[in-house]
């Protein structure tokens, strides 16, 4: 497995693969890799000849400097895991290589229809940072396919829209959320949980699934459902952050024409902000 840190060497390798007619898959990450990331790599391997994994803690998508400073950086362990899963290249650049003019003078790519609603409303600039770095990686690596986790539902929707609007010829693959045996969605931020909090954490998905079941049975009192879920989260020890039920395709409020809903949940447990989502078929 190749480990490349500079843009010229990356371009050279991508050019070589392109000349050889290789199909390239991209898995963008911020490192601190877990089994969920490995599932993305495994999926990418089935769809391409070579798999490029990027490891870059993107400063543009952090609104709090302390969050950026404390984000775990585990490059050596990450590379060992990726070697075992058969990745072909790890691109791990420095921020100065990605943003040579500095963050203040950086050109941005924004998807305003999706970047300022829901989670974007409470995290200003976050999704603009995501779309900017992903478009930059698309330009550098020129993948045929890119794999993203469905756990970050709004992020995946944003990237799909950016690809459609910007005319990228890239197949965007959403990979189902990987969960621990007790139902907790795998996340790099689970490492912030204490032992006691880790026992409580699966309640987030359980409360979400109970809500989804009520909707599947025909319940449509959205405000009441969300209030009940928030109260349940508080009771078990969470601080609810964001709870939404939206049209799965548009991320706008449900209408009579909505065929599928998505439940989007974010809640704090100690120092960890946990997120999860669940699709609900409304066509019954």
Curated annotation (Swiss-Prot):
A GO biological process held by the record: pantothenate biosynthetic process
Binding residue positions for beta-alanine: 61
Residues at the active site: 37
InterPro entries for this protein: Pantoate_ligase (IPR003721), Pantoate_ligase_C (IPR042176), Rossmann-like_a/b/a_fold (IPR014729)
A GO cellular component annotation in the UniProt record: cytosol
EC number(s) from the headed UniProt entry: 6.3.2.1
GO molecular function: ATP binding; pantoate-beta-alanine ligase activity
UniProt key word Transmembrane helix: no
Keyword annotations of the record: ATP-binding, Cytoplasm, Ligase, Nucleotide-binding, Pantothenate biosynthesis
UniProt binding sites for ATP: 30-37, 149-152, 178, 186-189
Residues annotated for (R)-pantoate binding in this entry: 61, 155
Cell compartments where the protein resides: Cytoplasm
Reactions catalysed according to its record: (R)-pantoate + beta-alanine + ATP = (R)-pantothenate + AMP + diphosphate + H(+)
Principal place of residence: cytoplasm
SUPFAM superfamilies: Nucleotidylyl transferase (SSF52374)
Broadest EC class assigned to this enzyme: ligase
Record-linked Pfam families: Pantoate_ligase (PF02569)
Cited PANTHER family: CYTIDYLATE KINASE/PANTOATE-BETA-ALANINE LIGASE (PTHR21299), PANTOATE--BETA-ALANINE LIGASE (PTHR21299:SF1)
Record-stated family: Belongs to the pantothenate synthetase family.
Subunit structure: Homodimer.
Extra remark beyond the main annotation: The reaction proceeds by a bi uni uni bi ping pong mechanism.
Listed NCBIfam families: panC (TIGR00018)
Protein name as catalogued: Pantothenate synthetase
Source species of the chain: Yersinia pestis
UniProt gene name: panC
């Amino acid at each position: 497995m190749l480990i490349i840190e500079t843009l010229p060497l990356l371009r050279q390798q991508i050019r070589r693969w392109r000349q050889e007619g290789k199909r390239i898959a991209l898995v963008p990450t911020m490192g601190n890799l877990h089994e969920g990331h490995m599932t993305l790599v495994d999926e990418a391997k089935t769809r391409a000849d070579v798999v490029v994994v990027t490891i870059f803690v993107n400063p543009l998508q952090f609104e709090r400097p302390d969050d950026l400073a404390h984000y775990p950086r585990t490059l050596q362990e990450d590379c060992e895991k990726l070697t075992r899963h058969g990745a072909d290249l790890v691109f791990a650049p420095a921020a100065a290589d990605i943003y040579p003019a500095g963050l203040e003078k950086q050109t941005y790519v924004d998807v305003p229809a999706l970047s300022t609603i829901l989670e974007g409303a409470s995290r200003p600039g976050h999704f603009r940072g995501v779309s900017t770095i992903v478009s930059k990686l698309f330009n550098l690596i020129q993948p045929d396919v890119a794999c993203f986790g469905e756990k970050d539902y709004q992020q995946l929707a944003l990237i799909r829209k950016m690809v459609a609007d910007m005319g990228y010829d890239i197949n965007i693959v959403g990979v189902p959320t990987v969960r621990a045996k007790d139902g907790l969605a795998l996340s790099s931020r689970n490492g912030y949980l204490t032992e006691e909090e880790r026992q409580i954490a699966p309640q987030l998905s359980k409360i979400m699934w109970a809500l989804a079941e009520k909707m599947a049975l025909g319940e449509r009192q959205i405000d009441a459902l969300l209030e009940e879920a928030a109260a349940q989260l508080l009771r078990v020890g969470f601080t609810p952050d964001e709870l939404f039920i939206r049209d799965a395709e548009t991320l706008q409020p449900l209408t009579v024409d909505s065929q599928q809903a998505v439940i989007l949940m974010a809640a704090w447990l100690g120092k960890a902000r946990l997120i999860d989502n669940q699709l609900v078929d409304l066509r019954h």
